[in-house]
């Protein structure tokens, strides 16, 4: 009897260990989100902790569509969010990710939610970049701030390999990237227009887009999951498509015109 009990106990442990994220979500009725504070996308009320922004609205709409409770479980970083997925600290990276091959290697990516632009920003008083062709940035005369392990680092290395790199840790606030340009530790930072507008609102030293105010890259924005969680991805993809077809996502985007997001890829 004792051996039978031990065998049963070990079997139950193995079963519990093998539970997928999808199975846990179905069992609990909850979807646990990792997130990164991102102006316009995920903003946190300092007094109440309430989350607001376009991707917050998107995720809450997905939760409603699937009859799942959304739990904003843990703050993470752009360069290390995949570690939290692998260690089951949260089920989905919900802040929104600029989709790339590099990120597809470390996380399972959903279908596209919408499209966002990445710009290069310099100090407003740095006249070197006024009307400068973008290809001229690929030179050792310029330093670009990137986040370790992030898509910004991949873009710098792919498009501007001859420029110098000023890297900041994935564990600290992305605002440090902005400040690196303000304090002249670097010349350029890659960011979304919303993040820089938020900074410029109260800043003495303003940042402005280079490249004649044209984006460096346009990215599809998605959410990320633990590699191998294809059942979870299928469920989330189906709900994303349903909300796109119903027009619900378009209504959400219309609330945030200042973010200049689009449902379709711009040519």
Regions found by a protein language model. Give the residues of each.
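Ligand-binding clefts/hinges and TM-proximal coupling segments of bilobed small-molecule sensing domains
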Residues: 16-19, 149-166, 204-209, 240-267
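Periplasmic-binding protein-like
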Residues: 114-122, 193, 200-241, 258-267
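Bacterial N-terminal signal peptides
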Residues: 1-11
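Short amphipathic alpha-helical coupling segments at ligand-binding clamshell hinges
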Residues: 54, 58, 140, 192, ...
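Flexible hinge/capping segments at coil-to-helix
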Residues: 124-143
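Hydrophobic residues within well-ordered alpha-helices
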Residues: 62, 85-86, 137, 178-182, ...
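Extracytoplasmic small-molecule ligand-binding "clamshell" domains
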Residues: 17-97, 105, 167-170, 255-256
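A ligand-binding cleft/hinge motif common to bilobed small-molecule-binding domains
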Residues: 79, 96-105, 154-158, 180-217
């Amino acid at each position: 009897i004792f051996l039978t009990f031990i065998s049963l106990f070990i079997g139950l442990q193995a079963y519990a260990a093998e539970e997928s994220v999808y199975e846990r979500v179905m069992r609990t009725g909850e979807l646990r989100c990792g997130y990164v504070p991102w102006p316009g996308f995920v903003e946190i009320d300092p007094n109440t902790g309430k989350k607001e922004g376009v991707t917050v609205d998107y995720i809450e709409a997905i939760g409603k569509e699937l009859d799942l409770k959304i739990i904003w479980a843990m703050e993470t970083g752009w360069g290390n969010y995949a570690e939290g997925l692998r260690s089951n600290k949260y089920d989905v990276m919900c802040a929104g990710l600029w989709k790339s091959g590099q990120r597809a290697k470390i996380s399972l990516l959903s279908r596209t939610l919408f499209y966002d632009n990445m710009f290069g920003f310099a100090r407003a008083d740095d006249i070197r970049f006024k009307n400068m062709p973008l290809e001229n940035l690929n030179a050792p005369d310029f330093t670009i701030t990137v986040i370790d392990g992030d898509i910004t680092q991949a873009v710098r290395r792919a498009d501007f390999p001859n420029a110098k790199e000023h890297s900041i840790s994935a564990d600290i606030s992305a605002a440090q990237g902005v400040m690196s340009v303000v304090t002249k530790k670097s010349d350029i930072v890659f960011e979304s227009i919303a993040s820089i507008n938020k900074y410029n609102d109260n800043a003495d030293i303003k940042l402005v887009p280079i490249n004649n105010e044209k984006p460096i890259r346009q990215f599809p924005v998605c959410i990320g999951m633990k590699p191998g969680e294809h059942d979870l991805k299928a469920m989330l993809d189906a709900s994303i498509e349903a909300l796109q077809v119903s027009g619900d996502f378009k209504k959400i985007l219309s609330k945030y015109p200042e973010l200049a997001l689009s449902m379709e890829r711009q040519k």
